[in-house]
Design a protein with these regions (language model features):
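Cationic, low-complexity basic patches in intrinsically disordered or flexible, solvent-exposed regions
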Residues: 6, 24
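A short mixed-secondary-structure module that forms the rim of ligand-binding clefts
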Residues: 77-116
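A short, Trp-centered hydrophobic/proline-enriched beta-strand micro-motif
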Residues: 50-66, 106-110
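Charged, gly/pro-rich active-site loop segments
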Residues: 37-39, 121-182
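A generic structural signal for short beta-strands and their flanking turns/coil linkers
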Residues: 56, 70-72, 82-84, 102-106, ...
Length: 182
């Protein structure tokens, strides 16, 4: 929806549509014209991977034991060559691990510099998480920056590698939005 100020036509907000029009406190939201709508496209994973290369932080969303959604920032630790699978290190005793053990369906949110109508990109990923406790796998995804968080490196007691395999990905970049072919 495009929300315009009465009698001026100035756009004051852009939001998800809720119907043909909504009025509140003198503002009227109307469905956008064809020129104001997002451009729906499909991109390949390689297209999106290039744009995601500089994004280190993702928001990992899990299902809690009471049915709520829990979110936390997770670092890619320099392992950002996106191929549909993401890896994150954490500790065994975290809520994220408990949530994934109960329900492996997760979501990831990525955002680069920029605003909604600038050159930044936003990517939402839905997928299935797997908990890996194998030291050989740790070594494949380990970077020296992780030593700041895990004092004994891959030998730190209680570390877990979270692997998220994407089943669906959506992106927004300026006026362009769409699904990613996985």
């Amino acid at each position: 929806m495009i929300i315009r100020k009465p009698n001026s036509g100035n756009v004051v907000a852009v939001c998800a549509p809720t119907g043909p029009h909504v009025e509140h406190d003198g503002l009227r939201a109307v469905a956008p014209s064809l020129t104001e709508r997002q451009i729906m496209t499909r991109k390949t994973l390689a297209d999106i991977a290039d744009e995601m290369a500089g994004i280190d932080i993702a928001i990992l969303s899990t299902h809690t034991d009471n049915g709520e959604i829990a979110n936390r920032p997770m670092s890619n630790n320099g392992d950002v060559t996106y191929d549909g699978t993401s890896y994150y290190f954490t500790y065994e005793q975290t809520r994220a691990v408990a949530d994934i053990q109960r329900n492996p369906k997760v979501a990831l949110g990525f955002s680069s510099e920029g605003g909604i109508f600038s050159d930044g990109i936003y990517v939402a990923v839905e997928g299935t998480a797997e908990l890996i406790r194998d030291k050989a796998a740790f070594q494949q995804h380990w970077t020296s920056d992780l030593d700041n968080w895990f004092e004994k490196g891959v030998d730190t007691p209680g570390i877990v590698l979270i692997k998220v395999k994407a089943s669906r990905a959506t992106y927004w970049k300026g006026r362009e939005e769409g699904e990613v072919d996985l």
